[in-house]
Every structure is written in structure tokens, then in C-alpha cells.
């Protein structure tokens, strides 16, 4: 349960202010309240659902989370969070000093929602190209389909948390190391 709250604390607080113009939240989310509920749902999925191996168990847990949202927050917020919203900490461009042109912060970390998966895919493709340019030995040549993108986002979330860790299990050659390199 503490991991859910740790994930909630990672989020950028400015996104929760009412009466302020916000950039798009992603999915069907239209309000700061919906954004908080979407973040809570996302963190519950990362903490509880990602550990399950059976699709039946995952579906049951998903429906339970959705039922809790409906019972607790009402129909309006339930509709806002029906569509999944993905949260990542690598969407922001590097911070550059206007006067000198120096890079002040190469990878600013703000845990926030992505508007859609295409935006994350485009950014991951550009990060992969930058990695390939800078690495002399290891090259990444990944096809980033939806499952690969969501796995990469999960790994990036774990790496951004204090004492975050993961045990990556899978068949050799399935992309565990490559996705971790990209997420880092």
C-alpha cells in the first residue's frame, strides 16, 4: 500500500489545482479530481495488477478497482477514468539556459500523464536514436509496440522511485535488457 502512496507523491502537484488552465490530462480526464483518481488507478494497477500472472486475476482486480472508483467517487469521475491514462517521468524536454544555450537539466523528471501512447512512442524512438548515437558498443533496435511501450514505462517508473527494483523474468531475447536500457 505504501508503494501506491509513493507513486502518488511522485506526481506534479500543479496538476491538481482547481480553477487553473491545465494542459490535456490524457484519456477522458477533464478535471484535476479526475486526474488524481486516474493517478490512483494507475498506481494501483502498477502495484497490484502488475504482480499477477493470470489474466482472470488481472481482470478481476481491474474490475474491483473500477468498482471502488464508482462507489467512492461517483459516475462523473468513473466516466473520466474509464480509459487508461499512463503516467511517466520522461516527457519534458531538456532545460536549456536562454542566454548561454547550456543544458541545465538533461532529463527533467516530472511524473505526469501522457496524452496518448503515440506521444510516448515518439519520445522513446528519439531517446533510442540518441542512445544509439552515444553508445559505441551496444545498439538498441527495438520495435516499440504497445506491450513493449507499457513494459518500458513500468520499468522507468520503478527506476524513478526510491529503492525501486524489479525482477525481470522472461525468455532470453525477449527484450528485458534492451527495454531497461531504454527506460534508464
Locate the predicted segments by residue:
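Walker A/P-loop nucleotide-binding motif
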Residues: 160-179
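Alpha-helical lid/collar subdomain of P-loop NTPases
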Residues: 1-163
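Active-site signature of alpha/beta-hydrolase-fold catalytic machinery across serine-
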Residues: 182
Amino acid at each position: 500500500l505504501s508503494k501506491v502512496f509513493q507513486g502518488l507523491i511522485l506526481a506534479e502537484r500543479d496538476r491538481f489545482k482547481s480553477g487553473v488552465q491545465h494542459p490535456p490530462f490524457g484519456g477522458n480526464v477533464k478535471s484535476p479530481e479526475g486526474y488524481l483518481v486516474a493517478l490512483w488507478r494507475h498506481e494501483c494497477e502498477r502495484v497490484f495488477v502488475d504482480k499477477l500472472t493470470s489474466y482472470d486475476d488481472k481482470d478481476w482486480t481491474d474490475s474491483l478497482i473500477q468498482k471502488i472508483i464508482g462507489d467512492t467517487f461517483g459516475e462523473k469521475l468513473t466516466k473520466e477514468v474509464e480509459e487508461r491514462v499512463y503516467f511517466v517521468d520522461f516527457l519534458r524536454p531538456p532545460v536549456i539556459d536562454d542566454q548561454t544555450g547550456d543544458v541545465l537539466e538533461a532529463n527533467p523528471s516530472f511524473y505526469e500523464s501522457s496524452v496518448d501512447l503515440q506521444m510516448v512512442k515518439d519520445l522513446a524512438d528519439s531517446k533510442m536514436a540518441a542512445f544509439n548515437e552515444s553508445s559505441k558498443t551496444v545498439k538498441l533496435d527495438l520495435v516499440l509496440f504497445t506491450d513493449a511501450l507499457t513494459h518500458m514505462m513500468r520499468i522507468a517508473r520503478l527506476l524513478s522511485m526510491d529503492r525501486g527494483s524489479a525482477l525481470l523474468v522472461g525468455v532470453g531475447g525477449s527484450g528485458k535488457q534492451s527495454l531497461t536500457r531504454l527506460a534508464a
